[in-house]
């Protein structure tokens, strides 16, 4: 029987399955951070259990770390406790930890792929909803809760039901300057923020194949924002070339044998999906969200929509509520909307290609008066690479703040946050009420679009910036 990529990955990891029971899956990699792990380790301790596979478990600090100092005390008491607990737990249970002083420390979903911990064909979990990022490698990756974190630590397995399958095909060639972020926002604009609920999504088509691994990670990172369980891109030469030579990747003959297997990880001809969505990449413009979910998104050249234009009464009410919170009026061109802050970073867009794209716009320009702009590299290696290329100097000269790695202003769990009423052009993944700080207004954009907003003080079409 012809199978989809998701079905192949799922079936390859079933440990036990019985009638009327949820299948038990083997987990190849478990990524851990300071926020969702303390109670899980406490549970192990209470029952006298070890970590079943410490060598398949990797930890880092990211969510509530300061991006201005490596001082563990800088983000407040709760953050300090969580980070100290992670150090203690990793030492006690023999788990590898990239702490604040480790050169590999960074956002968990940047660190995993960078170190070759993430590989095609794997099952990967983490107590974090954006674990879907790793699906870019043709791995089945999804977020789990703290009780499940404990279960995986104790058993290296997880009960998991089968999801429905959705194919999202993006054909044609994207115009210059159109990034994976624009593509995925356009997809969510079409499906809505709940359009993928109950599905695992496979992204395919010419425009997806043309993306780098970093672009594919951006794409899969936001699969969760359309409600999907996970996102997948079938591995190909782009994937193999990215993985080769990384710290935890197979070496020599082992690598060649792995690639031979990885090449089988694709949807068979004739395999049936439960749903299919198609887009034409040539029609995708730079995207900007205007509301309080990622599906409330338009092209930068458009105007704020009128809630009355929505036929669905639920969508209409949602739009009215969103505009009230966002302080926007229908009919106003997006390019007339001024911003207060800019955030370039997060597990969506903090990799080297993202920083290069932003620096290209920032080069020779200045951050607009009254705007605070942060650039937060996703990991120690990304920061080092950017500095080796001189990107930090471009940003600093333009008036951006060059920070230390961490989740930063993506979520209000550290010192980087919005004040009530402040408007932010952000390269992160969520724009719901209060996500970046109580009363903060978030607009999701690509790194180049964020840099353009920083230097113009409002949303600007990068296609017209010379």
Curated annotation (Swiss-Prot):
Transmembrane segments: none annotated. [4Fe-4S] cluster binds at residues 347, 407, 410. One of its GO terms (molecular function) is 3-isopropylmalate dehydratase activity. It is an enzyme of class 4 (lyase). It comes from the Bacteria. One of its GO terms (biological process) is L-leucine biosynthetic process. Its cofactor is [4Fe-4S] cluster. CDD domains: IPMI. Signal peptide: none annotated. InterPro entries: 3-IsopropMal_deHydase_lsu (IPR004430), Acnase/IPM_dHydase_lsu_aba_1/3 (IPR015931), Acoase/IPM_deHydtase_lsu_aba (IPR001030), Aconitase_4Fe-4S_BS (IPR018136), Aconitase_4Fe-4S_dom (IPR036008), IPM_dehydratase_rel_enz (IPR050067), IPMI_cat (IPR033941). Pathway: Amino-acid biosynthesis; L-leucine biosynthesis; L-leucine from 3-methyl-2-oxobutanoate: step 2/4. Catalyzes the isomerization between 2-isopropylmalate and 3-isopropylmalate, via the formation of 2-isopropylmaleate. Heterodimer of LeuC and LeuD. This is 3-isopropylmalate dehydratase large subunit. It comes from Cronobacter sakazakii (strain ATCC BAA-894) (Enterobacter sakazakii). The lineage of its organism: Bacteria, Pseudomonadati, Pseudomonadota, Gammaproteobacteria, Enterobacterales.
């Amino acid at each position: 029987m012809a199978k989809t990529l998701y079905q192949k990955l799922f079936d390859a990891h079933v440990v036990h399955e019985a009638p009327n029971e949820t299948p038990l899956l083997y987990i190849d990699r478990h990524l851990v951070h300071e926020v969702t792990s303390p109670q899980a380790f406490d549970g192990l301790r209470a029952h006298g259990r070890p970590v079943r596979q410490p060598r398949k478990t990797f930890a880092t600090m990211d969510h509530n770390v300061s991006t201005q100092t490596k001082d563990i005390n800088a983000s407040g008491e709760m953050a300090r406790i969580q980070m100290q607990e992670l150090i203690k737990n990793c030492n006690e249970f023999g788990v590898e930890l990239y702490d604040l002083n480790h050169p590999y420390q960074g956002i968990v979903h940047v660190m995993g792929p960078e170190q070759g911990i993430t590989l095609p064909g794997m099952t990967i979990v983490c107590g974090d909803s954006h674990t879907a990022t790793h699906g870019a490698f043709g791995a089945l990756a999804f977020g789990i809760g703290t009780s499940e974190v404990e279960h995986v630590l104790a058993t290296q397995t997880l009960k998991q039901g089968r999801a429905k399958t959705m194919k999202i095909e993006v054909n044609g060639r994207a115009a210059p300057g159109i990034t994976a972020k624009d593509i995925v926002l356009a997809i969510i604009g079409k499906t809505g923020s709940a359009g993928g609920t109950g599905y695992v999504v496979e992204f395919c088509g010419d425009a997806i194949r043309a993306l780098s691994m970093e672009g594919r990670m951006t794409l899969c990172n936001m699969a969760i924002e359309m409600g999907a369980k996970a996102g997948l891109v079938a591995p190909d030469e782009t994937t193999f070339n990215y993985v080769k030579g990384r710290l935890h990747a197979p070496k020599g003959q082992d690598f060649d044998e792995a690639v031979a297997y990885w090449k089988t990880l694709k949807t068979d001809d004739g395999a049936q999906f439960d749903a299919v969505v198609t887009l034409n990449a040539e029609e995708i413009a730079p995207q900007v969200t205007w509301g309080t979910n990622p599906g409330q998104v338009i092209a930068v050249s458009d105007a704020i929509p009128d809630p009355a234009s929505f036929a669905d009464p639920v969508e209409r009410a949602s739009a009215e509520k969103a505009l009230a919170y966002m302080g926007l009026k229908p009919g106003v061109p997006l390019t007339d909307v001024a911003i207060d802050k800019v955030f370039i970073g997060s597990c969506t867009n903090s990799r080297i290609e993202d920083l290069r794209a932003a620096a290209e716009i920032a080069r020779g320009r200045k951050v607009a008066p009254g705007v605070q702009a942060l650039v937060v590299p996703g990991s120690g290696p990304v920061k080092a690479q950017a500095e080796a290329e001189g990107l930090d100097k471009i940003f600093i000269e333009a008036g951006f703040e060059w920070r230390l790695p961490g989740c930063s202003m993506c979520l209000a769990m550290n010192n980087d946050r919005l004040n009530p009423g402040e408007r932010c052009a952000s390269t992160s993944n969520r724009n719901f009420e209060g996500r970046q700080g109580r009363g903060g207004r978030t607009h999701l954009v690509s790194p180049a679009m964020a840099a353009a907003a920083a230097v113009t003080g409002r949303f600007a079409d990068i296609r017209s910036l010379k």
